[in-house]
Every structure is written in C-alpha cells, then in structure tokens.
Amino acid sequence: MRFLFLFITILLCSTTIKAQRLYSESGDIYEKSKRNVVDHAKLGVFYELKFRKDSTKLDDYTEAQTVLMVSDKHLLFSDYNRLALDSINDYLASSKQNKKDQKAREEWMQAIKKWTFFFVTLTDLEEQKTTVQTYDVLRSYEYTYPTPQMDWQLVSGDSIINQKACKKAICSFAGRNYIAWYTETIALPYGPYLFTGLPGLIMEIHDEGRNWIFTNNGVGKMPQYSDMYLYKKRYFKDLIVTTRENALTGYRNDIEDFDNLSIEIYKVKVEKNGQMVTPEANNPKRPSNMLELQW
C-alpha cells in the first residue's frame, strides 16, 4: 500500500506542474502569465509533431501541435497550446466573473492536456542568438547561445507534402541525422525548432529513426496569439538560467531520475510502522529520448 501511495503522490505532482503555476496560493484564483513580449508574428507556420519519449517503443508516439511564428526580426517556435493556455488563463484571471466561466475553465484544462512539447525557442535574426526555455518535468531552464548553423547537403529526391512540391536535404544536428523536405515555392529559409538555412520552407523533417517527426499542416497569418514571448523569470519560481550544457544535462537528469528527484523536491512521505517517513530514493531510471542527444 505504501508503494501505491508513493506512486499516486508522484503522479499527481507530475501532472499538475503546469497547472500549479497558474493559480494563486489560495488555489482558487487564476494568476496572469508574466511575459517578455519581444515582437508580433506576421506569419505562422504550423507543424504536427510526433515524438517517442522512449525510443524502444516504436509505435508509442506523443503528438503535439506546434507553430513557428515569424516576424522580420525574430522566430519563435513552441507548442501552439502553450499560447492557447496562456490566453485562456489570462482571461480567467482578469475578473472574478471570468474565473467562473465554465466553458473557459474546460478549455483551460483541455489546453493543459494538449500542451505536450515543452521547449520554446526564440531566435533573434539580427544578432543570430537563440534563447531557449524548457518547462515541465521537475524544473524549468533557460539558456541563450549562438543560433546553430545547419550544414545541409542537398540530395536527389522529391515529394509532395501538404500540396507543395518538395526537394530533399540531409544534415546532422545534436547527435541525430535528419532528412528534410523543403519547398522552393515558399521562399523562407526556416523550419521547425532550430532547423533553418535551406532554400525554401521546410515542410517535413525527421531523424533517421523517426523518433522526432515534424510535418507541416498549415501556413498563414496567425489567426490569434500573435505575441512572441518568453516567460519572465519570476513566473516560474524554479526557472534556472544557465548554459546550454547545464540546462540540457539537468533536463535529461530530471526525466531519467524523476522518481528519485521528485521525492526530495515534492517532499514525498510514505507510511512505515505507523509513521510518515521519506522513502528511499532507489527507483530505476526512466528512459529519455530528447530531440537533442549531444551538446
């Protein structure tokens, strides 16, 4: 029974990480998101993302709806439902009447469930610097570094993706080999995440093992949510601003050692001989299959 209690406690902690940041300490008042808005998107490029959290489970994909937001000076890539969640949350937080809006509350919960990709990349096109924020897991991280330059090879091959004629290219990035399909009919050298530099918009890109698959499913003006922003540090009490190496190492450790680290972070207790005690942190590691394997 004590192990069941421990499992349930950790599970509840992990599934409420995002939600707990959107409430006041009293638990019944929505708190407006705190953002650093740097620009406004002129264009949205949408990508369906499928990724494996465990590379050994070949048919077990997590899905996300992501968006590349484009302005003259910046690119921002994130889960689209992050934008939706913040918008709904701020509406609920704006008045006592709004927080009772049952439809909005239900949409808020749905957006939380749909937000599954927890990296946000903001690229300054003039300075060629990228700031990345990662959320969820146990802690949140932020780092800024020179925007990576992809060493593309244009190779033979053609395809039709989302009704666009595409050509093939390959590259290696952060420990994975990628195959990309780009269209010269949209003369933007951009793509999902940090994949840029081809002579046309990337319509699909995936690693050779198909662990991470981005497929374009729309291009056009942002119908809503045009603000390009990262969160202010004070919005996440646990946001760690550090180097890329430290951030990605920490993020990987948080995934793999979640069951042990969460005992300390969430101050988990179990019953033993009639007393509540801290359990031993000797659980096996979980698998991780991050997009970036090397840094």
Question: Residue spans of the language-model regions?
Answer:
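Short beta-strand segments that buttress and anchor functional surface loops
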Residues: Y47-K50, K167-S172, M203-H206
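Extended beta-strand-rich segments in extracellular/periplasmic secretory proteins, especially
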Residues: Y141-W181, P189-G191
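Structured soluble/peripheral alpha/beta segments that form catalytic or ligand/cofactor-binding pockets
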Residues: R52, Y61, N177-I179, A187-Q224
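Extracellular or lumenal secretory-pathway regions
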Residues: Q20-Q149, D158, A165, R210-W295
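Sec-dependent N-terminal signal peptides
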Residues: F3-C13
